[in-house]
Structures are given as structure tokens and as C-alpha cells.
Amino acid sequence: MDYMVRRTDKELSQRKLEEYANFSKIINAGRQNPIWFSEFMYGVKLMDYQKWAFMESWYKPFVLWLEGRGAGKTTLAAVFLQTKMLLIPDYKVFISTNSAQQSIEVFKKIEDLALQRIPSFKTVTDIFANEVDKGVNSETGFLHNPAGHSFKLYNNSELVTLSTNLNAIRGKRGSVFYDETSWQTAEQMAVTENFINVDSSFGLGTTKNAHKDPIQMPLQLLYASSAGDVTFPFYEKYCTFSKKMFLGDKNYFVCDINADTVLNHSTVDGVKIKSHLTKEQIDAVNTIID
């Protein structure tokens, strides 16, 4: 008599096994090269300085982008967060700004990119939009709740906008994206920075695992802003993070992209392109500042 011992509680067909194998190959290839993934799967082309900031920020827990107006930091953040959420299961991100309206503007950038509403991105696909959990109350899955805009992917990754009511947002856990951080107060940062104070790889169970779980992607604090007042905490973080990066601490990354970089060094795959900023625009702003 022959006995058949099933390897899993659920039988999978050969076709289904092949689908899962191909899916795993694509996901793992994307984790190794997220720039390729965002271009090939999303149809989004980034400039070279954006690619550099993207890759250096991929796995580091503490990241700061100091970028001038027109450098495309919000667009870069939209692509970065979309890629990270799709490639990393159970990855939760909060958006923190100086007001609920600003958080919603960042959310809308991600939503518009996913739903192919940005004319300057001519080859965007619907792959990310198809990964958004539609639920039963939303046609697109992007929920516009007054208490906080949000959406969730089928892999249980989630993005939520935060209000400025500090008592209402205490105790949450997840990564945080700060936009226009130069004017955010120390009190507000102190509340949201505690969101990452948990080991993302920690887990318990009632049985011993016969395998080792993979190390999870660390939670991240990503500060993005143009330059502002040196009396706010963003300036102090810029100095501290820069020193740690220069000393070789691999947990920190800082990029400083000014108007000159955008004007004179805008390239795609090493080929110089026409900048979307002009010298006249930059001179006009400098005249106002002076």
C-alpha cells in the first residue's frame, strides 16, 4: 500500500506553482533593483539624480532629502513609496506634514500617478492601481476619509495621511514620510518619530519554526523639504545626518539638490536633457530673497 503525504495543507496545481514561482522571481528582482522595477513595471522614468537618491534611500532607516523647488521631491517620494509598498509586504507608511491639507496633496500625487492622471508621465502603467485593494465602498481603493486619506494593497501594505492633532496620532507604528519638514515643529516630530521604535523582524508563535524567517525591511523616517529656517529641527537633522553619513554610518543618507543641479546637471541615463527650470526663474527668486 502506498501512502501519500501532502507537503502543504492546500494542494496547488502545477500551473499555480509556476505562477507563484514567476511572481517570486519578479518580486525578488525588484527588491534587488527597485529602479528597474519602477521603470519596467510602472513605466516611470526618473532623472539620474533622482535615481541616486532613490537607491541610497532604499534600505536606510534615516534619510533626508534637501531639495530646492522644482527638483521633484514629491514625485520621487510617490514613486519611492509605491515601489517599497508593492515589494515589501505589510509595509505601513504614514505621511506627516504641517497640515492635513499638505498631507492630502502628497496622497493625491501618489493617487494621480497610480491612476495615470499626470500628463508629464507619458508611459505610466496601471500595475500599481490594480494592486490597490478596492474593497466594497471605493471604485479605485483610494479612500478620502476626512480623518485621514488612505489606501491598502493586496499584500497588506498601507499608506495613511496624518492630521496635526498630536493626541489623535500617538502610538502608531510604521514608517513616516515627512514633506516640507523645514517648518515642522519639534513637538510634532517627537510624536511621529516614535512610530519606528519597534523591531520589524520580531514575531512570536506557539510552535517552533522549521525555517528562519527573512530579515524584514527596517522602518524608515524620510524627511523631505526645501531649505527653510535654521531654528527648526530640520536644519539640526540635516547637520547630524550628514556627519553620520560622512563618518560611514550606513543607517543614514542625506542628499542636497539645489537649483544649480537641476538647471545644469539634469540627465537621464547619462544623457543631458533640457531642464524644466530656467536661469531667469532662479534669478527672479534670488532677487526676491535678496
Residue positions per predicted region:
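Phosphate/NTP-binding elements of NTP-utilizing enzymes
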Residues: 2-290
